[in-house]
Design a protein with these regions (language model features):
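P-loop NTPase catalytic phosphate-binding loop
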Residues: 3-7, 17-28, 36, 41, ...
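Nucleotide-binding motor/catalytic cores of P-loop/tubulin-like NTPases across gene-expression machines
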Residues: 12, 35-36
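Surface-exposed substrate-engagement region within the catalytic domains
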Residues: 31
Length: 133
C-alpha cells in the first residue's frame, strides 16, 4: 500500500496523467460505500430525455454524478473486451437499452450475433420489430 492510500484510508487510488484541457493530475478514490447505478434513473434523466444525439448511448454516471453519454454515430469503431465478470454484457445491454428507449423500430434495426445463445435472449420478443432483414 502506498503512502497516498494510507493517508486517504482507502485500499486503492487511481492516478491519471494530466487531465485533458486542464493543468492538473486526476486522483480517483473509490467510494467507501459503492452505489448501484440504476439504468432506469439514467434513462429517465433530463439529460438523456433531452439529448439530440443521432444514436444516444447512456453508459452510467461520472465521478461528478453526471449522466455519461456518447453518440454512437460519432464512434466509428467500438471494441468491447475484458475478463470474465468485468461487465462486457452489462455495457452491451446499456447500449441496446439506450437505443431502444430513444429510437422507433422504423429508425433502428439490429443485427445481433450471440454464439452462446444466452447474452441476447432477453431481446427475442423485440426482434420482430427491430431485426434487420
Amino acid at each position: 500500500m502506498g503512502r497516498r492510500t494510507v493517508c486517504l484510508a482507502v485500499l486503492h487510488v487511481r492516478i491519471t496523467a494530466a487531465m485533458p484541457g486542464k493543468g492538473a493530475v486526476g486522483i480517483e478514490v473509490a467510494n467507501k460505500v459503492p452505489q448501484i447505478v440504476s439504468m432506469q434513473k439514467i434513462i429517465a434523466s433530463r439529460r438523456f430525455q433531452e439529448c439530440r444525439y443521432e444514436l444516444p448511448v447512456a453508459m452510467g454516471r461520472t465521478i461528478t454524478d453526471e449522466v455519461f453519454m456518447f453518440d454512437l454515430c460519432k464512434t466509428p469503431h467500438l471494441l468491447v473486451a475484458g475478463a470474465t465478470g468485468q461487465g462486457k454484457s452489462v455495457g452491451l445491454n446499456a447500449i441496446i437499452t439506450s437505443l431502444l428507449y430513444k429510437k422507433h423500430p422504423a429508425e433502428l434495426k439490429f443485427v445481433m450475433v450471440d454464439p452462446k445463445m444466452v447474452e441476447f435472449s432477453s431481446y427475442a420478443k423485440l426482434l420482430k420489430h427491430y431485426l434487420a432483414v
